[in-house]
Swiss-Prot record:
GO molecular function: large ribosomal subunit rRNA binding
InterPro entries: Ribosomal_uL10, Ribosomal_uL10-like_sf, Ribosomal_uL10_bac, Ribosomal_uL10_bac_type
Name by which UniProt lists this protein: Large ribosomal subunit protein uL10
Gene Ontology CC terms: ribonucleoprotein complex; ribosome
UniProt function note: Forms part of the ribosomal stalk, playing a central role in the interaction of the ribosome with GTP-bound translation factors.
Family per record: Belongs to the universal ribosomal protein uL10 family.
Spans through the membrane: none
Pfam families reported for this sequence: Ribosomal_L10
Length: 167
């Protein structure tokens, strides 16, 4: 049974709202995935701050029209599951990467495209996006870069003090 107009409008509004808040989008074909696979993906998505939804492509196109994922509209072909990263840019790509590691019989070719910062990347690029650091990892990397010169200065001053004491 098809969706009525009100249901379609609600779906478009929901997807548009999610897309306006999302950092990235990963679209993959769900053809060939079992119900158990999709259930596993949905559970992991909730844990990792990823909004996962199977939606008709025409509704997805309308929802993405006024978002930064507008460039992905023409790539919405075939049976797709959309994964929006809600907490950091690489969350959806990591979800798929971890899923493929656990289910090695499923080909990574089912990822059709990745959209991030208004650009659409090929599906094969999802590994690169998955390697993006989380917010905490990024802050940690920045802090280590900022602390390294201070630590080096402290070691240098300590070495000068020790050489004066030895003399």
């Amino acid at each position: 049974m098809g969706l009525n107009l009100t249901s379609k409008q609600e779906i478009v509004a929901e997807i548009a709202d999610v897309a306006s808040k999302a950092y990235s989008l990963v679209a993959a074909e769900y053809h060939g995935l079992t119900v158990a696979h999709l259930t596993q993906l949905h559970a992991r998505a909730r844990e990792n701050g990823v909004y996962l939804r199977v939606v008709k492509n025409t509704l997805a196109r309308r929802a993405l029209a006024d978002t930064e994922f507008k460039a992905a509209e023409e790539k919405l072909v075939g049976p797709l599951v959309l994964a929006f990263s809600m907490e950091y840019p690489g969350a959806a790509a990591r979800l798929w990467r971890d899923f493929f590691k656990e289910n090695d019989k499923i080909s990574t070719d089912i990822v059709k495209f990745v959209s991030i910062s208004g650009e659409v990347l090929a599906g094969s690029e999802f590994e690169r996006v998955a390697k993006l650091p989380t917010k905490e990892e990024g802050i940690s990397m920045l802090m280590s870069c900022m602390l390294a010169p201070v630590a080096k200065l402290a070691r240098t001053l300590d070495a000068v003090r020790q050489s004066k004491e030895a003399a």
